Amino acid sequence: MSATQKDPRDIIIAPVVSEKSYGLIDQGKYTFIVDPRSNKTEIKLAIEKIFGVQVASVNTLNKQGKTRRTKFGMGKRKDTKRAIVSLKSGSIDIFTTVG
């Protein structure tokens, strides 16, 4: 592995568990929280390597962290990046294996 390649497990942080993401699974689209510094090509290669599926497209969105009032003044939650991954064929068994 060269110095420019990242480990796929460092790129894909976690699946998004929400009502909207469950609805997208029926369309063959899966939503993940990813490293904010990663690009669409890195996300595609990481998904293909981890889950062994063919990726058709990757859509990304950056979510700004909310500003919240705390006991010590104003604080800010961290910014996150999400990726919506469309598959050519097959499926990912992320949510069915949870006990």
From Swiss-Prot:
Question: Which terms are listed as keywords in the entry?
Answer: Ribonucleoprotein, Ribosomal protein, RNA-binding, rRNA-binding
- GO terms assigned for molecular function: rRNA binding; structural constituent of ribosome
Any one GO CC term of this protein is: ribonucleoprotein complex
One Pfam family this chain carries? Ribosomal_L23
Top-level division of the source organism's lineage: Bacteria
Q: Which GO terms describe its biological process?
A: translation
Assembly and interaction partners: Part of the 50S ribosomal subunit. Contacts protein L29, and trigger factor when it is bound to the ribosome.
Family that this chain belongs to? Belongs to the universal ribosomal protein uL23 family.
Record's function text: One of the early assembly proteins it binds 23S rRNA. One of the proteins that surrounds the polypeptide exit tunnel on the outside of the ribosome. Forms the main docking site for trigger factor binding to the ribosome.
HAMAP family, sorted: Ribosomal_uL23_B (MF_01369_B)
Database matches in NCBIfam families: PRK05738.2-4, PRK05738.2-5
Record's protein name: Large ribosomal subunit protein uL23
Organism listed in the record: Clavibacter michiganensis subsp. michiganensis (strain NCPPB 382)
Q: Which gene underlies this protein?
A: rplW
